[in-house]
Each structure stands twice: as structure tokens, then as C-alpha cells.
């Protein structure tokens, strides 16, 4: 009976330590897991369009990062900070002109359900703003060159 309790307790500890870490997601080497997706910071300086193209050409595909919750925002901010990024970082959000209407959507096609805009300017592409610890979004000129974060399926 004592052995059963000991083994059960050990399994419980392992389960609890792995839950919520993305441990069940199998990412390529150099990529980090969070909530069923893989993420990687690239320090290459690219325009927004070139960065998005680069992300889609990765072995498992993907897009510039979309951020759909405060938890994901914090994970990405930590990942960017750990990579000692010294400037703003592109994310996969762009203002799209459709006829006379504009819409904002993620490059992976998902709608914007979580927002964290720093301020709104008349530019079309968004970065994670360095001055806020990469936690808020600022729209800048799409032709500027910044590092970026790709998000891909596992």
C-alpha cells in the first residue's frame, strides 16, 4: 500500500510540473513551445513583408507571431527579452485595406480577439514595442527593418 501511494504521488508531481509548459508540443530545435504552438525569435533585420515571407518558408510553415491572450503576450515578451533584443520586433498584425474599409487581422488569418495597442499612428504594420518590455503593440512603417518572431504549428 505504501509503495502504491509513493508511486501515485510521484506521478502526480510529474504531471503537475509538466502541465501548462507546452511539454506535450514537439518543436524543432531552437524553437520554444507554448499552448500548442512553437515560437522563435530571429535577429535578422527584415521589412514586415520579408519577415512574414521568411516565417512562411520555415520547415513547418508558420507566420509572424499572433498574440491571442495576455499569457501568450507575456510568454513572447519573455522570449524576446531572453534573446537580448535591443529594438522593436515585428509581429503578425497589419492593417489591411479592402476597398474603402480597413481591417486589422493576424497574418495566420485569425481575427484580433486580444488587443494591447500602445498608441495608434497612421502606419500599417505592428511591432512589439521595446520601451514597454515588448508587451504593447505600436504601428510603424512596414518598410522599416526589425527582428521578428515566427509562430508555427508543432
Curated annotation (Swiss-Prot):
Q: Which residues does the annotation flag as glycosylated?
A: 116
KW Ribonucleoprotein (keyword) present: no
A Gene Ontology molecular function term of the record: toxin activity
Ranges for domain C-type lectin come to 34-151
What is the name attached to this protein's record? Snaclec agglucetin subunit alpha-1
Provide the alphabetized UniProt keywords: Disulfide bond, Glycoprotein, Hemostasis impairing toxin, Platelet aggregation activating toxin, Secreted, Signal, Toxin
Write down the superkingdom of origin. Answer: Eukaryota
Pfam family of the protein (one): Lectin_C
Amino acid at each position: 500500500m505504501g509503495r502504491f501511494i509513493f508511486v501515485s504521488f510521484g506521478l502526480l508531481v510529474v504531471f503537475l510540473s509538466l502541465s501548462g509548459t507546452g511539454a506535450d508540443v514537439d518543436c524543432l530545435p531552437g524553437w520554444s513551445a507554448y499552448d500548442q504552438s512553437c515560437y522563435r525569435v530571429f535577429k535578422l533585420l527584415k521589412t514586415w513583408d520579408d519577415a512574414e515571407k521568411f516565417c512562411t518558408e520555415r520547415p513547418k510553415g508558420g507566420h509572424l507571431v499572433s498574440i491571442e491572450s495576455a499569457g501568450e503576450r507575456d510568454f513572447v515578451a519573455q522570449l524576446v527579452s531572453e534573446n537580448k533584443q535591443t529594438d522593436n520586433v515585428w509581429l503578425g498584425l497589419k492593417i489591411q485595406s479592402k476597398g474603402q474599409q480597413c481591417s486589422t487581422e493576424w497574418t495566420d488569418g485569425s481575427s484580433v480577439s486580444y488587443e494591447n495597442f500602445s498608441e495608434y499612428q497612421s502606419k500599417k504594420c505592428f511591432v512589439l514595442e521595446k520601451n514597454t518590455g515588448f508587451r504593447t503593440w505600436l504601428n510603424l512603417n512596414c518598410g522599416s527593418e526589425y527582428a521578428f518572431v515566427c509562430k508555427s504549428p508543432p
